[in-house]
A protein has these predicted regions:
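Acidic, Mg2+-coordinating phosphoryl-transfer loop and its flanking beta/alpha structural elements
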Residues: 211-242
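Short, acidic loop-to-helix structural element flanking the phosphoryl-transfer center
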Residues: 113-116, 121, 136-165, 201
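A metal-dependent, Asp-based hydrolase signature
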Residues: 58-141
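Short coil/turn segments at beta-strand junctions that form active-site/ligand-binding loops
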Residues: 8-10, 162, 211-213
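Active-site neighborhood of HAD-like aspartate-dependent phosphohydrolases
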Residues: 2-53, 69
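Substrate-recognition "cap/lid" segment bordering the active-site pocket of phosphatases
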Residues: 165-215, 229
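Short, surface-exposed acidic
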Residues: 40-57, 82-90, 185-189
Length: 242
């Protein structure tokens, strides 16, 4: 987990997808969902698989959660669809992945790869292969997506007044590439993605600042929960009205 050395009296955590960049729809609809359909054999119910995944990742209270819990939740919703049952399609929810999620706080490919090496579990191997392919697809697809209007100006205003952290469930490599592509990585003390731990863990850095001097900017209930768990103020970004 990243440990900040405070340089200013204030700390601002910034979620990336959906807050700094308009990338949520692009990543999920063009990168995550096609790979979920392919890797989990959902071709016969692709319409409903897409609906379930879009609901979980974009349009529900689960918006913005880590990819692995989102995968499990999407499959669980899909299991319940009568249209899926009517087609005789059996949806399996990977129990080994659920167990790993329950036991691990740094839900990323490195820790999953370590568990695969330790156990050789087929469900974990499948989830790792899916996640690696998602990363590959994101790297090939996501480009030329500028920050939201006035994001740069907002960062300029915070510079010299507050320490800033990217606080995201996206892999570090993708975050670093996206922030560097547009020259805004210079504004933040660190980029803390899924390999750094959960958003709640990253925001434990708030304890180093005076009360009411810490803020999380997020677009999902999970961001709010991470903020309140660390006594941070919260600024909500309303999806669709960024």
């Amino acid at each position: 987990m990243y440990e900040i050395s405070p340089q200013h009296d204030f700390l601002v955590g910034i979620d990336s997808d959906g807050c700094a960049f308009d990338t949520m729809e692009l990543k999920h609809k063009e990168c995550f969902i096609p790979n979920t359909i392919n890797f989990y054999g959902l071709q016969a119910v692709s319409k409903y698989a897409r609906e379930a995944a879009e609901f979980v990742n974009l349009y529900s209270k689960s918006r913005g959660i880590n990819r692995f819990p989102a995968l499990v939740e999407s499959l669980e919703w899909l299991q319940k669809r009568p249209e899926v049952k009517a087609r005789g399609v059996t949806i399996g929810v990977p129990a080994a992945v659920k167990q790993w999620i329950a036991e691990e706080s740094k839900l990323g490919n490195p820790t999953l790869a370590a568990r695969v090496a330790e156990t050789g579990d087929a469900q974990l191997k499948q989830a790792l292969a899916w996640s690696e392919k998602v990363n590959e697809t994101v790297a090939g697809m996501v480009r030329d997506v500028p920050p939201f209007p006035f994001l740069r100006e907002s960062l300029d205003k915070l510079t010299g007044r507050a320490d800033m952290l990217v606080c995201s469930a996206t892999p570090n490599d993708a975050l670093t590439a996206e922030w560097a592509e547009h020259g805004i990585d210079k504004y933040v003390a660190a980029i803390c993605g899924q390999e750094s731990g959960s958003k709640k863990e990253t925001l434990t850095n708030a304890a180093k600042y005076p009360r009411n001097h810490t803020l999380m900017i997020g677009d999902a209930p999970g961001d709010f929960k991470a903020a309140t768990a660390n006594n941070c103020l919260f600024y909500p970004i309303n999806p669709g009205e960024e």
